[in-house]
Amino acid sequence: MGNYFESPFRGKLLSEQVSNPNIRVGRYSYYSGYYHGHSFDDCARYLMPDRDDVDKLVIGSFCSIGSGAAFIMAGNQGHRAEWASTFPFHFMHEEPVFAGAVNGYQPAGDTLIGHDVWIGTEAMFMPGVRVGHGAIIGSRALVTGDVEPYAIVGGNPARTIRKRFSDGDIQNLLEMAWWDWPLADIEAAMPLLCTGDIPALYRHWKQRQATA
């Protein structure tokens, strides 16, 4: 089977490769999956990918996703930790002895990845987590809980290493929500988007707001 990607140095936009209707993606987000060979559809691990009543994977705009990232999208997969057995008897239809089993499946809710999130190679996201805008997820991190905006997390389980910016700068970035801007506004701000000078970017945005 051939590699979906032509080069390890160039990803493909999610909007050009996602076919699963349960995956919703924003503009310009991309997946760079050369080292695993498959399209982004296979990063979302559904038990029943063709159903429309399952949890959704929602990814914002301007996200960068490394090769082999995985999003577990099957709720508890029918395994109940609080029961005497975690075995999913209900789904073994071929065995008559299990006919009286109760369906232990529980959904986890949609998995939400914010805007401008960077996801490292082979990071894994457990069902129902929410990742804030601007977060960085380290390679092979196991994300089991929600991640705050502009946090850098890593490890197994993933823990916050530090914040990318001061609380004030983060508040201003969230207020600006540059990922929602028209392309003309992004173009005008590009010299500042490519620096760490958040106060200058905020002043630029305020000035454009005042003259709009």
UniProtKB/Swiss-Prot annotation:
Its EC number is 2.3.1.28. InterPro entries: Hexapep (IPR001451), Trans_hexapeptide_repeat (IPR050179), Trimer_LpxA-like_sf (IPR011004). GO terms for biological process: response to antibiotic. It is an enzyme of class 2 (transferase). One of its GO terms (molecular function) is chloramphenicol O-acetyltransferase activity. Keywords: Acyltransferase, Antibiotic resistance, Repeat, Transferase. Pfam families: Hexapep (PF00132). This enzyme is an effector of chloramphenicol (Cm) resistance in bacteria. Acetylates Cm but not 1-acetoxy-Cm. Belongs to the transferase hexapeptide repeat family. PANTHER family: ACETYLTRANSFERASE, CHLORAMPHENICOL ACETYLTRANSFERASE. This is Chloramphenicol acetyltransferase.
